[in-house]
Design a protein with these regions (language model features):
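SDR active-site strand-loop-helix element
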Residues: 11, 36, 59-65, 102-108, ...
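Adenosine-cofactor binding site in Rossmann-like domains, unifying the SAM/SAH pocket
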Residues: 31-49
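NAD(P)H-binding glycine-rich loop region in Rossmannoid oxidoreductase-like domains
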Residues: 46-83, 93-96
């Protein structure tokens, strides 16, 4: 699909990944890019979802309520509800508005807690996610189910991209919600500034993770 003359919606376009997606779209010559702000367009509201996809050709759904271990432990209900509502309503209203392509961002947190390492793409249905991440991971996982169902019944063109853990410039360094790499960078930076000889790192060091630089 040639994107140059398409009207493109990027939810979460002001976020860490979204800024990079918008920059790349601009480099491809796309000029009509809509980036709604969460304060003006709450995607948990179905009416807002309906309005924001009106006249749109392609949707990149990158908006999410997301954070690190601390946030997942503190607000599992919010993470489940917010991400489920945003995703399922936006996809549905995109279908209703005859959007030509819907690209959603999934999460590696949807994969089972117990699986072989390295795991394959097909392993996503082979078990329950790690309990701390399960509300967020399962809410995102439902986009896979909905995408397949809408493709089969309505021939709606949607895909769910599941990257590994992301990091890079413009990442979230808020200690209450950041992921492991920015959290460690901040802890080490603060320790150096305050002449501390140690930092607190969660876990026992045994988990294996992979990361993707954005």
């Amino acid at each position: 699909m040639d994107l140059k003359n398409k009207k493109i919606l990027v939810t979460g376009g002001n976020g860490f990944l979204g800024k990079n997606v918008v920059r790349n779209l601009e480099n491809l010559g796309v000029s009509d890019i809509i980036i709604p702000s969460s304060s003006d367009c709450d995607l948990r509201n179905m009416g807002n979802c309906k309005k924001v996809v009106d006249g749109i050709d392609v949707v990149f759904h990158l908006a999410a309520h997301v954070g690190g271990i601390g946030l997942n432990r503190e607000k599992p209900g919010e993470l489940f509800f917010d991400n489920l509502m945003m995703g399922t309503q936006l996809l549905h209203e995109s279908k209703m508005a005859n959007v030509k392509k819907f690209i959603a961002l999934g999460t590696v947190c949807s994969y089972p807690k117990f699986t072989q390492v390295p795991f394959s793409e097909d392993d996503i249905w082979n078990g329950y996610p790690e309990e701390t991440n399960a509300p967020y991971g399962l809410a995102k996982k439902m986009l896979l189910v909905q995408s397949k169902a809408y493709r089969e019944q309505y021939d709606f063109h949607s895909i769910v991209v599941i990257p590994t853990n992301l990091y890079g410039p413009d990442d979230n360094f808020d200690p209450s919600s950041s992921h492991v790499i920015p959290a460690l960078i901040l802890k080490i930076s603060n320790a150096k500034k305050n002449n501390l000889d140690q930092i607190e790192v969660w876990g026992d060091g045994s988990p294996t993770r992979d990361f993707l630089f954005v």
